[in-house]
């Protein structure tokens, strides 16, 4: 993955998060954030238990955001999400910068397999 591609993916994930926190997020934004966290989890499992913990905390917050959306019809972030999702996004963006394209593609494919 070239620098430009990884930068685009990182900005897309961060913009999705921003829109979700301001109430302007869509289902596509939510799916992008959730998929980014799934890829981050696959990579974290290959790296370090602390990284796994960071991603799992974020995923718990992301699930709570989805539950809120199902209740009120609008995305938003609570204090837990505001605290736990940004570190996962930082980790994901670092993965994009420092992992090979093949490693990230493999992580994406593994996350898809786990969802099926």
Where are these regions (language model features)?
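Amphipathic alpha-helical binding modules
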Residues: 76-116
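Secondary-structure edge/capping motif, primarily at the C-terminal ends of alpha-helices
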Residues: 18-21, 43-47, 69, 92-99
């Amino acid at each position: 993955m070239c620098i430009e591609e990884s930068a685009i993916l990182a900005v897309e994930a961060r913009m999705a998060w921003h829109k979700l926190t301001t109430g302007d997020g869509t289902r596509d934004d939510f799916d992008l954030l959730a998929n980014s966290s799934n890829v981050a989890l696959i990579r974290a499992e290959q790296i370090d238990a602390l990284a796994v913990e960071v991603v799992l905390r974020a995923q718990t917050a992301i699930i709570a955001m989805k539950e809120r959306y199902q209740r009120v019809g609008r995305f938003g972030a609570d204090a837990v999400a505001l605290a736990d999702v940004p570190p996962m996004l930082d980790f994901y963006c670092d993965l994009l910068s420092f992992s090979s394209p093949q490693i990230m593609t493999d992580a994406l494919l593994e996350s898809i397999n786990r969802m099926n």
